[in-house]
């Protein structure tokens, strides 16, 4: 029975739609369908060409302008960075040259002070050496005179002890001859 009910309900639906089938495939309505297709396509074309496409083109142009400006700004910043690097390198080289110049000046000043101190020390040493040589010469001269006096006294005492006559001039001449030669 369910089969007959289903067939009866299905038959009623077919009768309501008619026996022609799908209306899109009905050749009698193709002219009307083509007309409305063309009208719809023209309306879509007009909407796209007048409203949507200009907006899209404006957005694309704006993006292209932004990209171009960003690229130009990047090139400008790159040039500034290269310029800053060159200025930094030049300043660094100048600072190194200045430091070397200051170090050379300081070395020269220190060397001059050292040379001056050495010259002063050499002069003091030479003066003290001259004084020492003078003192040594005086001591030698005094010692030589003392040796001559002691030698003359000893020779006189020996001559007297040996029983000879003490001749002071002869003893002094003999001592002078021995000490000088």
From Swiss-Prot:
Sequence ranges of Low complexity compositional bias: 1-18
Domain of life from the UniProt record: Bacteria
Membrane protein topology class: Single-pass membrane protein
GO molecular function: proton-transporting ATP synthase activity, rotational mechanism; proton-transporting ATPase activity, rotational mechanism
Organism: Ruegeria sp. (strain TM1040)
Family per similarity comment: Belongs to the ATPase B chain family.
Localization in the cell: Cell inner membrane
Its job: F(1)F(0) ATP synthase produces ATP from ADP in the presence of a proton or sodium gradient. F-type ATPases consist of two structural domains, F(1) containing the extramembraneous catalytic core and F(0) containing the membrane proton channel, linked together by a central stalk and a peripheral stalk. During catalysis, ATP synthesis in the catalytic domain of F(1) is coupled via a rotary mechanism of the central stalk subunits to proton translocation.
Annotated TM spans: 34-54
The keyword Transmembrane helix belongs to this UniProt entry's keyword annotation: yes
Record region (Disordered): 1-20
Name of the molecule in the record: ATP synthase subunit b 2
Gene Ontology annotations for the cellular component aspect, listed alphabetically: plasma membrane; proton-transporting ATP synthase complex
């Amino acid at each position: 029975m369910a089969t007959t009910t289903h067939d009866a309900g299905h038959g009623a639906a077919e009768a309501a739609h008619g026996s022609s089938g799908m209306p899109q495939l009905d050749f009698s309505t193709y002219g009307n369908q083509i007309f409305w297709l063309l009208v719809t396509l023209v309306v879509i074309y007009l909407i796209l060409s007048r409203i949507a496409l200009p907006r899209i083109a404006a957005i694309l142009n704006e993006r292209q302008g932004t990209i171009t400006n960003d690229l130009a700004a990047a090139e400008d910043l790159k040039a500034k960075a290269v310029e800053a690097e060159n200025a930094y390198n030049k300043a660094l080289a100048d600072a190194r040259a200045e430091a070397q110049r200051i170090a050379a000046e300081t070395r020269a000043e220190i060397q001059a002070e050292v040379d001056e101190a050495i010259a002063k020390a050499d002069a003091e040493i030479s003066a003290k050496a001259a004084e020492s040589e003078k003192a040594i010469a005086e001591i030698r001269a005094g010692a030589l005179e003392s040796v001559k006096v002691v030698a003359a006294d000893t020779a006189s005492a020996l001559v007297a002890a040996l029983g000879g006559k003490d001749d002071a001039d002869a003893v002094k001449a003999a001592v002078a001859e021995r000490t000088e030669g």
